Amino acid sequence: MGMKLNSFDLVIGFDTEYVRVDLSQEDENVPANAVPIEEQIKAGNRVVCYSVAIYNPATGQKTSACQNIEPLRAKRWSITTLLQKTIRLANKHGLISTERIQRAEQDNDKIKIALAAHFSRADLPGFSDFEKLKKRFDAVRKTYATVRNPAVFQPKIIKRRPSFCSVRLYDTRLLAPTGSGSLDKLGALLGIAKLSVPEVENKSSQMVAGITRMDIVQRDHPVEFENYAIRDAQIAVSWLIKIDEFRENWNLDNLGPTIGSLGAAKIRQVLGEDECEFLGLEHGPTSKRRNDMVFKSGIVNNISFIANSFHGGRNETFVHGIYDSEPQRPYLDWDLAGAYSTGMAFLRMPDWSNPIHTTDLEALLDIDTCAVAQVKFEFPPDTRFPSLPVDAIEMGLIYPLTGTSYCTGFELKVAQNQGATIKVLAGLKFRFRTDNERRPLVDFIQAVNIGRAQSRLDSKTHSSPLELLYKECGNSGYGKIAQAVARHKTTPGVHTKNVFNTRTGEMAELEGSPITNPLFAAVITGLIRAVVSEILCNLPSHVQVVSVTTDGWLSDATTEEVTAATRGPLCTLFRQLRTMVSTDGSDEIVELKKSALKVLSCKTRGAFTIKQGGPLPETVILARAGYSLEKHRGSDLETSLEFVRIFSERTADTKMLRRDFISIREQWFYAADLIDIPKNITLNLDFDWKRQHRN
């Protein structure tokens, strides 16, 4: 039976409120970074309350509660105590019957509980038994959730007799759309406002944000405190209910722990009986289980060569400094429409049994095949935007005039059209089968787009929760196809991604997903890079191109010039794919995202609006180059202008304060509360020299 919300007896959202110990000391003027990290970890937090929101998925009944505790470690609850008190409360309010609790006194009829939290690794350490608890859930993207077996607890609910409870932990942060990862944003999507707490006076008679001193809020504003604490638990439950509604709409059997897992499940569903043939999988010699299947020989024998041709996006900045636009030529930020989902539509059923090895350039230029190659190349010296990627390891991809590249056939096509001299050192391609021309991922992308269309609001500025979930699942599909492909690379550099296994306390190599395929990953990313490169090289020479970031670019090209630049063979292919996946059959392949009249460009992924204007005058270009401001600004424009000020006044000694949480590995080994560690880092908004300046 699949794990759906209605397969649980209870859904329990939970939250803890706490205050950092160093902020509740007598001397509050001592900066946090003056305290050694080891002491901060040891001091941890003071938990002041536990709050729960309870939901019965069978009846729709709900209730909630908040329980204050003394802020001492000795007074912390165990998770078993939380379950005991919560199930008793649910029983009192009719959400679970006494008879059901008594049945669970037998191990074969456990009470099934879905435990929902938002960023669970902030809350789980608030339990007294975290030392044991940390091994009973799985680490997923720097937080905790249940991926494998549920945890079993035995709270004493009726007459001190233990009842067996099977608990699956869901972290709503892992189930949130991009840009909506905070509780207040999830609440806004649901129409449930995340509450705030008032400012409070600390021991130094200073007014500080209440969220930093929840112990004082609890004492001086008890009603606001309780409402705030309960609301956080309610939002977690409500979002999990929305995720289950999404699962039901998409006809999926399981409520996965992440949005990516839901996307992968849908891809497998639409693949149906073509799944193994499409992905190039077959049963191994010792097992017939799906999880034990292996790649066919056509992939296995060439897996490192294929993986060497798998890269990320094209990310470069071409200028450095502040740039004013010319009259009637504002800076426009363009994106490829649905880049990766459209790229996925290229894939048909490969003939895995007949890999073709060749050094014939013409054979690799066939853009109706899946081709990868290692080549030596040289572009004409006046080429503005060379198009063959070279992995510069720590610098990422660079695009030199001459060098050796692992690339795809799509990129070779663009380079040839630019007049590059190309020598193929090794090449490999797979043709598509002629007896089965199905494009399986088109079915997936259409399911995404149909779901988005059906869930769309009338508003042009707001999206519904379901629309965002469909979009996120569509975007996650490519990520699952590419998961752990890089570990097969043999080129210089560290390509293996290690993850921490909380069940064992050891580091482990990230494994592929059920739909990982190295050739598909290489081909999809190669197609996107090739299309973007073709557009760049087709722009007129007078166009000022500021930067390119994966599937978009910033330049002062007019709409007409951009349209003319999208008429090459790769853009034509991309346009054909676009018609297959767009709900209205549109073949538009570019979309305008932002505009500005004056911009700062400093480095890759570092660009800022100085003066708004152009066709989208309310938008702000804000690529922060990995930095964030210590103090929040009221708008994106204010944030952008503050970065411009910092850039203009910076010196070689300029520092920026950054607060990073201790790693999940550190937290696990110390059984520590979640704390952040302030660090002063040297600011680097300088040109990154992925290209050589010419003037």
At which residue positions do the language-model features occur?
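Structured nucleic-acid-interacting core domains from mobile-element enzymes and related host factors
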Residues: 1-13, 29-31, 324-327
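Two-metal-ion RNase H-like nuclease active-site motif
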Residues: 8-20, 332-334
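Papain-like cysteine protease catalytic domains, especially those used for deubiquitination
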Residues: 12, 22-23, 109-110
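An active-site-proximal beta-strand-loop segment
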Residues: 16-44, 474
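Conserved acidic
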Residues: 40-119, 124-695
